């Protein structure tokens, strides 16, 4: 007679087998393990480059030279050194009462997303892989590579778990592998000025992203992914990063003779006409950073950089948070000071010119925005309550623009509440007399004009565009604000969650957002039809991309407004 003990032992053995940690083999024989989370195998905190510390601080990433053997990829790595995104949330709480106006089911996820990058370390070049449970190395699943945003001064891959995308892809019968990459931000990743340019280490953050993509090309097949079917996508500065990866090296996205990526999605971001790495903005940001770190920016290029590399992480973190422009919650001026810059290397020319001259990777893409992108940024100018105040504020952030250019902007964006953002709300939601006007300017300057520049310049590839309006008339003052799409993609399952995920998963699989989604047909953008998908809280519809033509066209043509 078989004992009860035997059956219990057998049952425990089966359970143990089912819950066994997933593994992957790298470099031929180095075994790493991850964690089974429900129906998703997760591998978190995998190094893809050597730690950018000591003499490697501010430099381009170097290939990982360690061993993966025995790595327990159970937890996200620390975020790269950065500003605290909680400062932005705190300001919005103070100015617009964020905690009161955001619906209950979105408030918690918003704060969770902001807190994803609290733990920081300069040793931060790690990535994460999410795949359907039990995926075999020969599965050849499409790969979705996520690049986070954060104004190029904060952000972390830990804020964006890929479980939801993987689960949805399995339910659709179109399984994918999801990868998220850390990259350096602020002065660590986008230090500008003469010194770093002469050293040849500009745009280190873009090189981090590229090094991550090279790792994917070399290794993702070991996790069941297909290196010949990689889609890159990102939001805000992540989308701007995607835009710059498309024009990197004049559109050459190859590595070892193969494309690093084969399609792209840009959410709330596109190419910006940044001035080059030795222009006034990045040079002054470099000088301020050195000054607050206790280094003499006038001592000579090599001496100043050596001084900065000798400082502790705490000293440099304090310096980054001590700028005299920090009264604008450390976002806008530093965003204009730190970011991808033409350097004659990875970015050989201004991004607008690279697109307009056809020097971009010829891959299909999706680009779109939230309707009221600028409302979450407008509080930086909360004290601008009259037209003269607004012009003075514009001159402050658009220092290269002439008075005539600024007057033109003000005439195209009048102070009428009914024409500002949140759009289509009449006289409502005017936090201050100029709030809606400033929010509209931000929306079109930073988001809508780069989107249209891209669409107009890339006539030889298939492209789709969208406008998201899911929070229209639901969130006072903010409307469908910048970043609200992330809540539905990564943190809640309601309303437009399935639209974002299913369209994007289909695009990763087929380079067409319409296959097997059970959603509204999304027509491809054409120059004649200007077809645009509109994403609502419930359902989607097609419309024409024909709003605010004159104002947005002015931003497209006058690059001095970005200086």
Curated annotation (Swiss-Prot):
Its EC number is 3.1.1.3. Residues 1-19 form the signal peptide. Disulfide bonds join 80-124, 295-307. GO terms for cellular component: extracellular region. Glycans are attached at residues 302, 383. The keyword Lipid metabolism applies. The modification Pyrrolidone carboxylic acid is found at residue 20. It holds the Pfam family COesterase. GO terms for biological process: lipid catabolic process. One of its GO terms (molecular function) is triacylglycerol lipase activity. The keyword Lipid metabolism applies. Hydrolyzes all ester bonds in triglyceride and displays a high affinity for triolein. For unsaturated substrates having long fatty acyl chains (C18:2 cis-9, cis-12 and C18:3 cis-9, cis-12, cis-15) GCL I shows higher specific activity than GCL II, whereas GCL II shows higher specific activity against saturated substrates having short fatty acid chains (C8, C10, C12 and C14). PANTHER family: CARBOXYLESTERASE (PTHR11559). Monomer. This is Lipase 1. It comes from Geotrichum candidum (Oospora lactis).
């Amino acid at each position: 007679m078989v004992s009860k003990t035997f059956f219990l032992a057998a049952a425990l053995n089966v359970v143990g087998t089912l819950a066994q940690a997933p593994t992957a083999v790298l470099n031929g024989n180095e075994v790493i393990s991850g964690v089974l989370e429900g129906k998703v195998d997760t591998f978190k905190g995998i190094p893809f480059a050597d730690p950018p510390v000591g003499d490697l601080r501010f430099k381009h990433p170097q290939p990982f030279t360690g061993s993966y053997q025995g790595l327990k990829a159970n937890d996200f790595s620390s975020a790269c050194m950065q500003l605290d995104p909680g400062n932005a949330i705190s300001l919005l709480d103070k100015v617009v009462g964020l905690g009161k106006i955001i619906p209950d089911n979105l408030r918690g996820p918003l704060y969770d997303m902001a807190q994803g990058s609290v733990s920081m370390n300069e040793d931060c070049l790690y990535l994460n892989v999410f795949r359907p449970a039990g995926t075999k190395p020969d599965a050849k699943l499409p790969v979705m590579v996520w690049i986070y945003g954060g104004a190029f001064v904060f952000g972390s891959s830990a804020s964006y778990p890929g479980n939801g995308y993987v689960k949805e892809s399995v339910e659709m019968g179109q399984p994918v592998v999801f990868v998220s990459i850390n990259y350096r931000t602020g002065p660590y990743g986008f230090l500008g000025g003469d010194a770093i340019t002469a050293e040849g280490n500009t745009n280190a953050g873009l090189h981090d992203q590229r090094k991550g993509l090279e790792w994917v090309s070399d290794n993702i097949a070991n996790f069941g992914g297909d290196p010949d079917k990689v889609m890159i996508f990102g939001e805000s500065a992540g989308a701007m990063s995607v835009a710059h990866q498309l024009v990197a090296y004049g559109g050459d996205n190859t590595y070892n003779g193969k494309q690093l990526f084969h399609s792209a999605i840009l959410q709330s971001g596109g190419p910006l006409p940044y001035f080059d790495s030795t222009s006034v903005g990045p040079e002054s940001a470099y000088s301020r950073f050195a000054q607050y770190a206790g280094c003499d920016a006038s001592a000579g290029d090599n001496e100043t950089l050596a001084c900065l590399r000798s400082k502790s992480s705490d000293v440099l973190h304090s310096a980054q948070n001590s700028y005299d422009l920090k009264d604008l919650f450390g976002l806008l001026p530093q965003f204009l000071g730190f970011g991808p810059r033409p350097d004659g290397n990875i970015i050989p020319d201004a991004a607008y010119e690279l697109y307009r001259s056809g020097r971009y990777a010829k891959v299909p893409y999706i680009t779109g925005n939230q309707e009221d992108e600028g409302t979450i940024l407008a509080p930086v100018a909360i004290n601008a309550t009259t037209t003269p105040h607004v012009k003075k504020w514009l001159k402050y952030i658009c220092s290269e623009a002439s008075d005539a250019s600024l007057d033109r902007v003000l005439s195209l964006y009048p102070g009428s509440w009914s024409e500002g953002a949140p759009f289509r709300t009449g006289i409502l939601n005017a936090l201050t007399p100029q709030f809606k006007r400033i929010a509209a300017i931000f929306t079109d300057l930073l988001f809508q004009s780069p989107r249209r520049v891209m669409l107009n310049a890339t006539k030889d590839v298939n492209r789709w565009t969208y406008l998201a309006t899911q929070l229209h008339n639901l969130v006072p003052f903010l409307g469908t604000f910048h970043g609200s799409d992330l809540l539905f993609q990564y943190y809640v399952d309601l309303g437009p969650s399935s639209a974002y995920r299913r369209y994007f998963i289909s695009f990763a699989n087929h380079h067409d957002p319409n296959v097997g989604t059970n959603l509204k047909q999304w027509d491809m953008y054409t120059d004649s039809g200007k077809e645009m998908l509109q994403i609502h809280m419930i359902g989607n519809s097609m419309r024409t991309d024909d709003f605010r033509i004159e104002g947005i066209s002015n931003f497209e043509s006058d690059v001095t407004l970005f200086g």
